[in-house]
A protein has these predicted regions:
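A general structural motif
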Residues: 17, 51-53
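Short secondary-structure boundary micro-motifs
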Residues: 9, 53-54
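Charged, alpha-helix-enriched surfaces in structured cytosolic catalytic cores
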Residues: 5, 30, 66
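Conserved catalytic cores of phosphodiester-cleaving nucleases, focusing on short active-site segments
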Residues: 8-31, 35-36, 40
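Short, surface-exposed, polar/charged, turn-prone segments marking secondary-structure boundaries
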Residues: 23, 39-41, 47-51, 83-88
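Short, charged, amphipathic alpha-helix that recurs within catalytic cores of restriction-modification
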Residues: 31-46, 56-60
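A short acidic/basic microdomain associated with nuclease active sites
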Residues: 1-2
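Domain-level recognition of nuclease-like catalytic cores that cleave nucleotide substrates
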Residues: 54-99
């Protein structure tokens, strides 16, 4: 991106939004910090998407309910994966934050 490189686990782009997705086997608090750094780098290095909302998403197989609450407070989507079930967690009052 503009001569700068960094790795994203996954990126989804729609007409009016971008979703930066971190995929982890075990969620750790540092994963949120990493996601936020990736969002900032993406915003700086993709002027073609400057008018799009940017959302953060973390996907993990190993997590606890406190992780879901913490991410919800930050406005970050959380998706869990177990066996053959994929679930988007949106606790009551969840408001996704757009960067």
């Amino acid at each position: 991106l503009n001569g700068n490189t960094f790795e994203l686990d996954m990126l989804a782009v729609s007409e009016d939004a971008c979703y930066i997705i971190e995929i982890k086997s075990k969620y750790r608090k540092d994963d949120l910090k990493q996601l936020l750094k990736h969002i900032e780098k993406y915003k700086i290095n993709t002027p073609e998407h400057k008018n799009k909302k940017i959302f953060g998403v973390i996907v993990a197989t190993d997590f606890n309910k406190e992780n879901i609450k913490e991410l919800a407070k930050k406005g970050v989507y959380f998706i869990s994966v177990s066996d053959d079930i994929i679930k988007l967690h949106q606790p009551e009052g969840f408001n996704p934050f757009a960067w």
